Design a protein with these regions (language model features):
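Acyltransferase
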Residues: 64-65, 334-359, 391-399, 412, ...
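An N-terminal boundary/leader segment
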Residues: 2-103, 341-352, 539-544
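A short helix-breaking turn/cap at a secondary-structure junction
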Residues: 244-341, 361, 418, 537-544
Length: 544
């Protein structure tokens, strides 16, 4: 990967404003900016950065130069975080344009000039100078037709797309490989664990690169996608706030798909304001997304209005002990249990009504997992395998140009088989899930598919919806580890994760508020209340 280099003159100007750090004992031996005019790039939220931009204390161009310098120091050298696949070669030019607009009094929105990174499965227009590949060399053979729908909305609001983040290749649907590894990006690793991935610093997936980039101070915020846990899990492991929106409330058009039944597009950032400010721009109707119309009555133009530091008052929170708080059945690290329980008690003391436990009917049905292979061992894996075959073909034929004959899932499989040196390096073989999906027939005439879809719907109605009705709940509260993200997948529901603590190797962990479908306002309220009363997230010790 070639990251665009800072121009020497720009770097000289930058160092006049920035404090630098020689992190040779922790990361890169290359000096890189730590702060700009009092804004610490490692800890500052998008809200902090936006305020500094509005105050005229920093410019978007200065931010871009600083972020690129930080990426160059520790992404492919230094700590080798491997969170970024490409940096936009046009970023400095666009930043200068946005600064000129601001100087002329033309500020598009609260995120005007804010540099963000987006997962490499979001289409970005070729004018930005970046590829969209889902981490795969196969998609490097073609170009995106234009911006994904949500990218177009964010750019119109003045957001600056700084780069494309690493991910599980094809967002984890390819087969059994480690989290946040892709052929193009390599193995992403946590900035929080000394020794990185080899020492247990698994960043989570599939949006691991997005999360690590924000935690390392490479961008103000990031976009991820979530089919089951792909925003919630990596955000948690990077000590970030993250929002997995209800499926359909944000558009998926122009995003490399896994499953139209479950996919969603969302945000990871360092504060809840950051989440709400980006989400409210993304949450608009898209006539090309089949799931968008159903969400229209529930959309709000302003989601920052739901930030409420006293939001726990009179909030009814359900605790589904089985199976999601059971460390034995769910396999999450026992070292985090005490922190989870202490957090729960503090939330109770802040005025929330804690209903503990709430009993999930047929809890055993929730103890499935996506094994990442050919097996269709649950309703979820059945639906996803049928979906990816047809959804990928639709994406390739409607959202790409110059496809070089790459029009079906089978074409991707064939490319990968023909290029094992690129796609199957030692330890990262193979593509069993894609192969199994490609062998399936049409989903519209498949009894297996529609039966699985019906079963998923019943699991939601008789499980998640039952809990909300039976116990008169506002949200559920669950650990982010241990499979709780399937509540969002099955319910197509919003999940908001908050940072809680750090385990014995300093890997962060979190908790998540789960709302009813389209009830993002209550989830944001709960996240905001949490943020107001709990300690600020710690920055990665490898970079501090």
């Amino acid at each position: 990967m070639k990251i665009s280099r800072l121009l020497p003159a720009a770097f000289v100007a930058l160092t006049a404003l920035a404090q630098s750090s020689d992190n040779s004992t922790k990361g890169s031996s290359v000096s890189y900016p730590v702060s700009l005019n009092g804004i610490n790039l490692l800890s500052a939220s998008a809200a902090n950065i936006s305020a500094a931009l509005f105050a005229g204390n920093i410019t978007s161009l200065e931010l871009v130069d600083a972020y690129i310098a930080r990426i160059e120091a520790n992404d492919r050298q230094g700590l080798e975080l491997r969170s970024i696949i490409e940096v936009a070669p046009t970023a400095r030019e666009i930043a200068a344009q946005l600064d000129q607009e601001r100087a002329a009094g033309n500020v598009r929105s609260s995120i005007h000039g804010l540099p963000i990174v987006v997962k490499d499965n979001y289409n970005t227009d070729v004018e930005l100078g970046m590829n969209t590949t889902a981490g795969s060399y196969a998609l490097l053979q073609s170009q995106a037709k234009g911006d994904a729908f949500v990218i177009s909305k964010l750019r119109a609001a003045g957001a600056l797309i700084l780069g494309k983040a690493n991910l599980d290749e094809f967002a984890g649907i390819r087969g059994s490989v480690t989290s946040a590894w892709s052929g193009r990006g390599g193995q992403c690793q946590s900035a929080y664990v000394v020794g990185g991935f080899a020492a247990g610093g698994d960043p989570g997936g599939s949006s691991g690169g997005s999360a690590v980039a924000v935690s390392a101070g490479f961008a103000a915020a990031a976009l991820g996608t979530d089919t089951e846990g792909s925003i919630v899990n990596p955000a948690s492991r990077a000590a970030l706030f993250g929002l997995r929106p209800s499926t359909g409330i944000t558009s998926r058009t122009g995003v490399v798909p896994i499953s139209t039944s479950q996919d969603t597009t969302g945000v990871m950032a360092k504060s809840v304001w950051d989440i709400a400010a980006l989400f409210e721009i993304m949450a608009v109707h898209d006539p090309e997304d089949a799931y968008s119309e159903a969400a229209e009555p529930f959309r709000r133009q302003n989601y920052t209005q739901f930030l409420d530091g006293n939001g726990f008052q009179n909030l009814r929170i359900g605790i589904p002990r089985e199976p999601f708080w059971n460390e034995t059945s769910q396999g999450y690290r026992s070292a985090i249990t005490a922190g989870l329980e202490a957090t729960l008690e503090k939330i109770r003391s802040l005025g929330a009504t804690i209903v503990d436990p709430v009993v999930l009917p047929d809890a055993e049905k929730w103890k499935y997992s996506f094994v990442g292979g050919a097996e269709r061992n649950s309703n979820g894996t059945i639906v996803i395998q049928y979906d990816v075959k047809e959804d990928m073909a639709h994406y390739l034929t409607t959202q790409r140009t110059n496809t070089s004959g790459l029009e079906t899932l089978g074409d991707i499989i064939t490319f990968n088989d023909a290029h094992p040196d690129l796609e199957f390096p030692p330890g990262y073989c193979c593509q069993a899930t894609l192969v199994a999906a490609d062998q399936l027939g049409p989903r519209n005439t498949s009894g297996e598919y529609w039966n699985a879809k019906w079963n998923q719907q019943q699991l939601n109605e008789e499980g998640i919806e039952y809990l909300f009705r039976e116990y008169d709940l506002d949200v559920l509260l669950v650990p982010t580890e241990g499979g709780s993200s399937r509540l969002g997948a099955v319910g197509r529901s919003p999940i908001g994760t908050v940072p809680v603590g750090y385990d014995e190797i300093n890997l962060p962990y979190g908790m998540a508020f789960v709302g009813r479908r389209y009830d993002e306002p209550t989830v944001i309220r709960a996240m905001s209340a949490y943020e107001s009363h709990f300690p600020k997230r710690a920055v990665p010790p490898t970079l501090d």
